[in-house]
Amino acid sequence: SIPTDATLDLDEQISQLMQCKPLSEQQVRALCEKAKEILMDESNVQPVKSPVTICGDIHGQFHDLAELFRIGGMCPDTNYLFMGDYVDRGYYSVETVTLLVGLKVRYPQRITILRGNHESRQITQVYGFYDECLRKYGNANVWKYFTDLFDYLPLTALVESEIFCLHGGLSPSIETLDNIRNFDRVQEVPHGGPMCDLLWSDPDDRCGWGISPRGAGYTFGQDISNQFNHSNSLKLISRAHQLVMDGYNWAHEAKGGTIFSAPNYCYRCGNMASILEVDDCRNHTFIQFEPAPRRGEPDVTRRTPDYFL
């Protein structure tokens, strides 16, 4: 575990971040180095114990992440599992991702952070994180530290051997969790193939595999979910990646759930957000929340394309 002076240092950084104040470039660099050491030891299918609170996309909506912690409890009092998409689109990607990585370094056993499709060099150059780093630091170094770190994030997690958690969805190239365990994940998100599918695919009402309108990943039907759950002794697939107006929805006869944790997404969608609490007995409860009160959003024009709205 971390020596006391380092711990005090980190605690100070976390409380600074909780006030939505970014760290210095040097602090971010050191933090990412420590985080990399921790993440290197985690599996592509990272085991997680209950009780745990499972969260979906945050997308740089820092004040709503603070609201999530207010409702769900602060780390380390509550164990958390975040399913990716910390950056892009919102105005505070830097503060959001730095806080989550800071919590990971401080409480590695209490928080699990997975990779989303936005935790990629290519996507962040289009949807805002790269530009935000330039604006806040005057150069791209912080963007580079984080995007290098993103390559080490686990792709999926398994809660108590029965709830399979990941950002996007299933892949026609993956039949078992062991298939996923055998990937080399330390790379930029590929344009196709199984690793890409885990971060990009979506459940669908139609059976079988379908072409995804997103241009990456696949759509998959209830028959596919059932087969995967059966082959891997799973009760539930929990994922994020899609805006849902109630903050959550069930698909595939409650064998699959979507969790979205960015309320009033892009500051204009009017949706609720939710988190999923899994207790010691593995009962699960969705908790909905609304946006945190806004105190003067920066006036940033939206020039980024909306690839799914």
Swiss-Prot record:
Catalytic reaction list: O-phospho-L-seryl-[protein] + H2O = L-seryl-[protein] + phosphate; O-phospho-L-threonyl-[protein] + H2O = L-threonyl-[protein] + phosphate
Transmembrane spans: none
Taxonomic superkingdom: Eukaryota
EC number: 3.1.3.16
Residues noted as binding Mn(2+) 2 in the record, renumbered to the chain: D85, N117, H167, H241
Active site: H118 (proton donor)
Chain sites annotated for binding Mn(2+) 1: D57, H59, D85
Cofactor binding mode and count: Binds 2 manganese ions per subunit.
Any one Gene Ontology molecular-function term assigned to this protein's record: protein serine/threonine phosphatase activity
InterPro entries: Calcineurin-like_PHP_ApaH, Metallo-depent_PP-like, PPA2-like, Ser/Thr-sp_prot-phosphatase
Enzyme's top EC category: hydrolase
CC cofactor: Mn(2+)
Keywords: Hydrolase, Manganese, Metal-binding, Protein phosphatase
Signal sequence region: none
Family listed: Belongs to the PPP phosphatase family. PP-2A subfamily.
Protein name: Serine/threonine-protein phosphatase PP2A catalytic subunit
